């Protein structure tokens, strides 16, 4: 029951919402987390939790960082209404919810955004470290898609903050790889 890993400089502990599904043979549900996680976080005296990406993704091992469904709450833990209930339960306990959001790249799987309309609409190139597509931020359609997506999560699910993952890969074309 101890937090996984060491806390960062702000006292945050890393880890997915459900770090041990294989031990139980199933994932916790949003409803389970509404009780167990909320009570635990409140009892520990924390004011906020940061959840890893909640968008749909095909590979469990990615913890949500290889997103395919930017507008779909992952069904691993339940349905969208149950996610809303979980976030409401956090708020009722005085706990804010910060959600990881992944604008730095997206899953290269065929059923994702890659060549969505038969052309390279969203993608720019493959990220060499992650094997994911980079968004083409020069395109207005891409910027509109991403801004609309952030607003979707803030307005519909009432998350209190967004942590943008992989910002350096959006800012620097060398993907954070040091030149010799």
Regions from the PLM with identified roles:
Residues 2-180:
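Substrate-binding/active-site clefts of carbohydrate-active enzymes
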């Amino acid at each position: 029951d101890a937090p996984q890993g060491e806390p960062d400089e702000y006292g945050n502990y890393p880890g997915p919402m459900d770090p041990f599904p294989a031990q139980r043979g199933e994932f916790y549900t949003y409803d389970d987390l509404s009780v167990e996680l909320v009570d635990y976080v409140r009892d520990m005296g924390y004011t906020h939790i940061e959840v890893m990406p909640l968008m749909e993704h095909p590979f469990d091992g990615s913890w949500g960082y290889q997103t395919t469904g930017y507008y779909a709450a992952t069904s691993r833990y339940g349905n969208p209404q149950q996610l809303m209930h979980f976030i409401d339960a956090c708020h009722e306990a005085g706990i804010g919810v910060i959600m990881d959001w992944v604008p730095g790249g997206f899953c290269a799987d065929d059923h994702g955004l890659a060549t969505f309309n038969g052309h390279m609409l969203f993608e720019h190139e493959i990220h060499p470290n992650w094997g994911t597509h980079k968004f083409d931020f020069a395109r207005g359609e891409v910027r509109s898609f991403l801004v609309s997506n952030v607003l979707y999560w803030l307005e519909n699910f009432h998350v209190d903050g967004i942590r943008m993952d992989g910002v350096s890969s959006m800012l620097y074309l060398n993907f954070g790889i040091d030149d010799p």
